[in-house]
A protein has these predicted regions:
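Small/polar/charged residue-enriched interaction surfaces, especially the RNA/DNA-contacting tracks
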Residues: 1-157
């Protein structure tokens, strides 16, 4: 068995930059994606279906993460068949079920290998999120802001 560079860090970096451009608040999903790895591949894959209706930018972040994961796995294990289709929750149940059943065909060893790579990808996404996330507001009030607020509200002093 030869060593294969998965390029997980590079993929994670690109995913975070794209998500930040799309909607910087969607980066909060990085932590939830990492936590959802504990529930397995199938549930991680299905997370974009759950988010699609109410939080589409977060769903896109999960979807793009899954696509990057599939790309990584295809380059390292072309023989491995994992669901690569990213469906919408409006798809026919037959189509969703057919795609989800691909998980059942994976051996335990293949599932473990895939999950290890997915966890590494999500860990890298969290790492890059912590470094690249844009702040929506400054963490501390400026001294001038505090002085102005106390001038406008004499009861606060």
């Amino acid at each position: 068995m030869a060593w294969h560079p998965f390029n997980v860090d590079h993929e994670a970096h690109m995913l975070v930059l794209e998500a930040r451009e799309r909607d910087r608040d969607s980066l909060n999903q990085a932590y939830k994606m990492r936590a959802s790895c504990a529930y397995g591949l199938e549930r991680f894959w299905g997370e974009h279906l759950r988010l699609r209706g109410k939080e589409p930018t977060k769903a896109d972040f999960v979807k793009e993460t899954w696509k990057a994961f599939c790309k990584i796995m295809k380059e390292s294990r072309p023989d491995l068949i994992i669901p690569q289709e990213v469906l919408s929750n409006r798809e026919k149940e037959v189509d969703i079920r057919a795609e989800a059943e691909k998980f059942l065909r994976l051996s335990t060893a293949d599932q473990q290998e895939c999950l290890t790579v997915l966890v590494a990808l999500c860990d890298a996404i969290v790492w890059w999120t912590q470094r690249l996330k844009l702040k929506s507001k400054p963490p501390h009030a400026d001294a001038n802001d505090i002085a102005a607020a106390s001038e406008n509200n004499p009861e606060s002093t």
